[in-house]
């Protein structure tokens, strides 16, 4: 390393570190035009003071669902002062009271009383304000399946979707965000009959799309010539392995720190590999933590069994959970979609083709993540 290659103590590789933060919302949002336009169309009635169409955004983690909602919400805030758009993280706000409290805070700028107020009174305050001020409310329920896990999905959805029946003039639309439509198995007929969402699919990004998006982050996040095309291709390969674009953005950030720690003006492949080794379990564990208890139990059985036939796996799973084959089949497909398992048909079983299921990660890594919750 020559003198010109050495990064001085008061210098940095980052032109704008915020571009590489997980909550950064880029102006340029490539490869999601059809999804953005579908979402805009569904919300268009709210710009005219009408109740919008309900939506369900479906796709694996790291495919831009939440970012798409936040981008359109930002547009709504600029062009439609009569619309209130609220995003609720259902991992955090997982009860009916917590969801309405989040909406209350956005409407009034303060938190509701911690105790001594009933849900009905709180909800009435929110809806009466919307009616009297002639505002339309759009609620995005991010990770809506967590309300299912906690047993509150139906009461939350029913309260929001049927508010206009009890409070004439109330105009509320709901956007559900989930990894898989089967996550909403808990919704009953009362809710489904009024939810009737426009489903918007977010497929995994392809290799070229991942490269395009990461190039844009590199352009605005780093100074020129900090990362070469070859090193960026290595980052892309790790993103393809995990299926989560957020992994790539985090790797760029961590790799930059590694290069700075070495005092280098450029990011090396070693910086990327070191960053991935340090963070790979963080991303795996984060993803596993989002699974339902039953999905975690199934994944544990798969990890411990190595390669296992679907019939044998179902027998063990049913003994453990008492759940039926339909739920089991859906969970296997979901774990495959999330890139945790391979579940391919192979060979011949007693009654035709059989499915061999195996984990895509080291069993030890999966089990360690499951222990962490």
Swiss-Prot record:
Disulfide bonds: none annotated. GO terms for biological process: DNA replication. NCBIfam families: orc1/cdc6 family replication initiation protein, PRK00411.1-2, PRK00411.1-5. It comes from Methanosarcina acetivorans (strain ATCC 35395 / DSM 2834 / JCM 12185 / C2A). ATP binds at residues 63-67, 205, 217. InterPro entries: AAA+_ATPase, AAA_16, Cdc6_C, Cdc6_lid, ORC1/CDC6, Orc1/Cdc6_arc, P-loop_NTPase, WH-like_DNA-bd_sf. Pfam families: AAA_16, Cdc6_C, Cdc6_lid. Belongs to the CDC6/cdc18 family. This is ORC1-type DNA replication protein 2. GO terms for molecular function: ATP binding; ATP hydrolysis activity. Keywords: ATP-binding, DNA replication, Nucleotide-binding. Involved in regulation of DNA replication.
